[in-house]
UniProtKB/Swiss-Prot annotation:
Signal peptide (from-to): none
InterPro entries: Biotin_lipoyl, GCV_H, GCV_H/Fam206, GCV_H_sub, Single_hybrid_motif
PANTHER family: GLYCINE CLEAVAGE SYSTEM H PROTEIN (PTHR11715), GLYCINE CLEAVAGE SYSTEM H PROTEIN-RELATED (PTHR11715:SF3)
Record domain Lipoyl-binding: where: 24-106
Name of the protein in its database record: Glycine cleavage system H protein
Species of the source: Stenotrophomonas maltophilia (strain R551-3)
Length: 131
């Protein structure tokens, strides 16, 4: 398993959130999730201006093996999407925590960040999942 960046927070369903400090949060799926899915062939992103709700489905990733819903770690308004993923969904496989980000949300409730797992808790959840 790859290194889990220390600046991220996670949902147990393998989505990550990076607080950008300007009231915005960048979201993607974890390296563990992309590894389980295998080669991604399609990504359905939310539209800019759409409303994300914490723990609700906001996007879809499809691999040669399966389709998987992506849940938003936080609530707010979508202000940017990584449209490059439309042509190169495999970017998530190659760089899940970097160029493979999915969207940016303008946070509506910063308290929701406290509900997310820190990297250590996420790593523990992965270990529990493997047993």
């Amino acid at each position: 398993m790859s290194e889990i960046p220390g600046d991220l927070k996670f949902l147990k369903s393998h989505e990550w959130a990076r607080v950008e400090g300007n009231g915005r949060v960048t979201v993607g799926i974890s390296d563990h999730a992309q590894g389980l899915l295998g080669d991604l062939v399609y990504v359905e992103l939310p539209e800019v201006g759409a409303t994300a709700k914490a723990n609700e489905q906001i996007a879809v990733v499809e691999s040669v093996k399966a389709a998987s819903d992506v849940y938003s770690p936080v609530s707010g308004t979508i202000v940017e999407v990584n449209s490059a993923l439309s042509d190169k969904p495999e970017t998530i496989n190659e760089d899940a925590y970097g160029d493979g980000w999915m969207y940016v949300v303008e946070l509506s409730n910063a308290e929701e960040l406290n509900e997310l797992l820190d990297p250590d808790a996420y790593a523990e959840a992965l270990e529990d999942e493997d047993h």
